């Protein structure tokens, strides 16, 4: 049986302008907490992030394990290789759809959470099948 594909929608400029500051604030918080600020080479490390993309996972939809070091997404107008992945959770009224790292570490996420993690092969992750309802998230990548 063929895997059901998730519905992906890119954002409009108006929505990007509205959500962008929240995403950037989450990035700044991550950088302050996890990156040594005294290292001069790190300052200004994150220059920008991609346009926000919305994902809808309907019942029966999942995303197989993968990692986000995706060169082909970043060969257009904004060039670069992703450094950080940004995931925002927009709702909770669904069942299943757990976010899992390394095939076994489930990350509990609720509506309004923004998770930031490295975009490289050391952080494989997946979204388990949604068994009831629809799961809505947004994603972006910083570089």
Segments predicted by a language model, with ranges:
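Fe(II)/2-oxoglutarate oxygenase catalytic core
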Residues: 1-114, 122-143
